[in-house]
Design a protein with these regions (language model features):
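Positively charged, low-complexity terminal tracts
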Residues: 16-185
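Sec-dependent bacterial lipoprotein signal peptides
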Residues: 1-18
Length: 185
């Protein structure tokens, strides 16, 4: 009887892996969701020129072919993200914000950028273009804030300097192939 314990455990584990693989393809899920530490943003409220108190924590969704990455809440809805084929251009507003934030006399600034919609509205696979809007501004408390609006009908998300640095750290690791977050799906 004791000789059957190990084979039974291995059989159960193999079955779990097969069930997970079956679920992935049966639901046509062509991505995986990973936990990423310290990725957050606030809901920006333009009428108050500030963020809400609550922070929204993000995980990342990465396509199976590693061509796209998006910030997601939990395992579901994609908020905004990046594509490998246009990574340098798409991350430039984030890098420029960090330079802008170092100048205490910097004036508010707005940048608009056409990008693939594949990271907006919950899907990674739409390839129509939408206009992302990046606002560099100071809050009422004079804190530099990057406000990202990934679509004209989307909410705006505010990121502090530290949050932008954390976001770039994760995005750069993904682009370099060294991202190692815990897999959630």
């Amino acid at each position: 009887m004791r000789y059957l314990v190990l084979p039974v455990i291995l059989l159960v584990l193999t079955g779990c892996k097969a069930l997970t693989t079956f679920d992935k393809y049966a639901t046509m899920r062509l991505y995986e969701v990973y936990e990423a530490e310290n990725l957050s943003a606030c809901d920006y409220k333009p009428q108050f020129r500030d963020c809400t108190v609550d922070k929204r924590s993000f995980n990342v969704r990465i396509t199976d072919d590693k061509s796209k990455i998006a910030l997601v809440v939990g395992k579901r809805y994609a908020y905004f993200g990046f594509t490998r084929d246009d990574f340098a251009r798409q991350t430039q507003p984030l890098r420029d914000f960090l330079i802008w934030a170092e100048d205490p006399n910097a004036q508010d600034k707005q940048i608009k950028q056409l990008r693939k919609a594949g990271n907006v509205g919950g899907s990674l696979f739409y390839n129509t273009e939408v206009e992302y809007q990046f606002d560099y501004l100071h809050t009422r408390a004079d804190v530099p804030l990057l406000v990202v609006k990934p679509h004209e009908n989307a909410n705006s998300y505010g990121l502090t300097v530290e949050e932008v640095k954390n976001l770039l750290s994760v995005m750069d690791a993904w682009y370099a192939g060294t991202f190692s977050g815990k897999q959630l799906t």
